[in-house]
Structures are given as C-alpha cells and as structure tokens.
Amino acid sequence: MRPLDAVELAEPEEVEVLEPEEDFEQFLLPVIHEMREDIASLTRERGRAPARNRGKLWEMDNMLIQIKTQVEASEESALNHLQGAGGAEPRGPRAEKADEKAQEMAKMAEMLVQLVRRIEKSESS
C-alpha cells in the first residue's frame, strides 16, 4: 500500500445532492414499483401452485379409475371366457395365466392408489 498524500485527504469527492422529492422519484419510486411487481408475481404463482397440484391429482385419479376399469374388464373377460369354454372342465394353463395377470393388474392398481394417497397426504401437510 502506498501512503496517502495530504492533498488527496483534503479534497473530498463532490456528490450531487438531490432534493428529497427528486431522490424519491428517481431512485425509490422505481424500486418500489419493481418490488410491487415481484410481490404480485409471487402471489400469483403461489395461487397457481395448488391449482396445478389439484390438476395433477385429478389427472392421476382419472388414470387410476381407467386402470381399475381395465382390470375389472380383464377379470370379467377371463371369467366369461372360462364360463363359455365350459366351467365344469378342469382349469387349463391359459385360465390360470389369465387369473395371474388379473391379480397382477389388481396389485398394480392398488399400489397406484396407495401412491396417490401418499402424495395427497404429503401435499396437504
């Protein structure tokens, strides 16, 4: 570091001093408007987030209903196929395979229902 000269210490920088009204209009007013816009933007975003989450949950609920409907239709189709082929006959490997598939689909649907319930519970907390 170099030592300061006495001349440098004696001459302070000149700073333009504004009237309070000019200062307010030039510097504070734009900042206040910008802050208001930011607050309004954050408020709008905060309002949209729950709506988006509700939309996602509604979409997931519809998917679960479709899956459940498909599982029930598959089970019914498998049962109708077995009854049409003669329910008194011993069950063949195709019937057992159809039952296994129906059970797997039912398990998947139940797991999806549990997942949605956990998501709903975590979002409501």
UniProtKB/Swiss-Prot annotation:
Indicate the quaternary assembly.
Found in a complex composed of MORF4L1, MRFAP1 and RB1. Interacts via its N-terminus with MORF4L1. Interacts with CSTB and MORF4L2.
For the null mutant, the annotation states: Male mice are viable, fertile and show normal T-cell function.
The alphabetical list of record keywords is: Coiled coil, Cytoplasm, Nucleus
User: Main localization of the protein?
Assistant: nucleus
Query: Is the keyword DNA damage in the record?
Result: no
Give the signal peptide as a residue range, or say none if absent. Answer: none
The record's Pfam families line, in alphabetical order, gives:
MRFAP1 (PF15155)
The molecule here is called: MORF4 family-associated protein 1
Q: Which organism is this entry from?
A: Mus musculus (Mouse)
Q: Where is this region: Disordered?
A: 76-99
Localization recorded for this chain is: Nucleus; Cytoplasm, Perinuclear region
The text of the family note is: Belongs to the MORF4 family-associated protein family.
Annotated Gene Ontology cellular components are: nucleus; perinuclear region of cytoplasm
Coiled-coil-forming residues are 94-124
Give a brief account of the tissues where this protein occurs: Widely expressed in all tissues examined and as early as 7 days during embryonic development.
